């Protein structure tokens, strides 16, 4: 297998879906086999490659075609102001991307906002949904035990409103459990993504003013999702409360939960080796 990098796997597709007319989506595409689509979270500067570069190689080596999507309004994809809840629009973007790429069915891996998109996809397009792997997904309403929004979400919106290296570092400091992993390379890479398209940040805030995070809630429909699902959570997540994982496994017909100790909101990055082993076993045998 040749070495994977962002530039050699990069491509664009143009989709036409409700709310996303003649819309360019950027993705990284590598490998052959069953399709695994990885969906990133919603923080400023997020993108498919930066979210999943520690995962794409092992998945390709295991025999999967791996697609890392830049969600609408993020990184290299077109910018957008959304008039509907973001998880639903993002799900449509995945469906449109699959249509262009000729993919009939895919497994979905979703972190935070990407998890909300994966849940919406499974509800809207069940026949095109393989297995689901969710890491601290959004879109699950209030918590019985934790005041919301949590600290990390407050800092995320502060970064959207006041983008600077200082506000970025404030958010990253609660993003990961092990702060020694917050390297200058991580900070500068994220900051470069933020600076690349400031319209993304403005439009995210405009979208959030139209439809707040509470509008993303798909909890009442969790029982409709029949796909086999692996839910993972960082025990020390300061963005989305751990009890939401219990809500998922209590209400979805075929869901299991794995909690990573000493782990924040980015399990697939902070505990990449363990995450890769767990999720690849689930795809093969779960």
Swiss-Prot record:
One cellular-component annotation, GO: membrane
Signal peptide: none
Active site: 265
Origin superkingdom: Bacteria
Catalytic role in ketonization of the dienol substrate (substrate destabilization), annotated site positions: 190
SUPFAM superfamilies: alpha/beta-Hydrolases
Pathway(s) where this gene product acts: Aromatic compound metabolism; 3-phenylpropanoate degradation
One GO term of the biological process aspect: biphenyl catabolic process
Keywords: Aromatic hydrocarbons catabolism, Hydrolase
Site (Transition state stabilizer) residue list: 112
Catalysed reaction, written as an equation: (2Z,4E)-2-hydroxy-6-oxonona-2,4-dienedioate + H2O = (2Z)-2-hydroxypenta-2,4-dienoate + succinate + H(+); (2Z,4E,7E)-2-hydroxy-6-oxonona-2,4,7-trienedioate + H2O = (2Z)-2-hydroxypenta-2,4-dienoate + fumarate + H(+)
Catalytic activity, EC: 3.7.1.14
The keyword Hydrolase appears for this protein: yes
Domain AB hydrolase-1: 36-271
Molecular-function GO term, any one: 2-hydroxy-6-oxonona-2,4-dienedioate hydrolase activity
Subunit structure: Homodimer.
Family matches, as NCBIfam families: biphenyl_bphD (TIGR03343)
Family recorded in the similarity comment: Belongs to the AB hydrolase superfamily. BphD family.
Function in brief: Catalyzes the cleavage of the C5-C6 bond of 2-hydroxy-6-oxononadienedioate, and probably also 2-hydroxy-6-oxononatrienedioate, a dienol ring fission product of the bacterial meta-cleavage pathway for degradation of phenylpropionic acid.
Protein name: 2-hydroxy-6-oxononadienedioate/2-hydroxy-6-oxononatrienedioate hydrolase
Source organism (scientific name): Comamonas testosteroni
